[in-house]
Amino acid sequence: AVAHLHDHCEGRIAVASGADRFKVEMMLRQVGLMGFFEGRIFSGHEMPRSKPHPDVYLAAAAHLKTDPARCLVIEDTTVGITAGVAAGATVWAYAAPPAEHAPLLQAGAQRVFTGMQQLRL
């Protein structure tokens, strides 16, 4: 799914996380995805304000030289969804079963998916 998004977006994808950069990079390396995001990782720890504020998403959009309204945010928490919505982005939520979808939709997610194979633009 990440490779598909990377190709579809011509490499213009980023990670915007509330976690610290070291942890994010470590996780991406462990799962073999670091190459898709090299130089495009943004941490809330490095922003004036972290989620639920939109700063990390706004920084990622600015780096990609795109309007946040043209960005798709993929989130798994209500705090992250709130941040994505505040940035003006379209937000989709990932919820591993048996997670409840209602809180994610109430926070502003436009769509909830339960498996990465469902992630198609």
Predicted features along the sequence, with ranges:
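Conserved phosphate-coupling serine/threonine residues in phosphotransfer and NTP-handling enzymes
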Residues: 17-19
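Asp-based, Mg2+/Mn2+-dependent phosphohydrolase catalytic module
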Residues: 3, 9-11, 21-22, 26-121
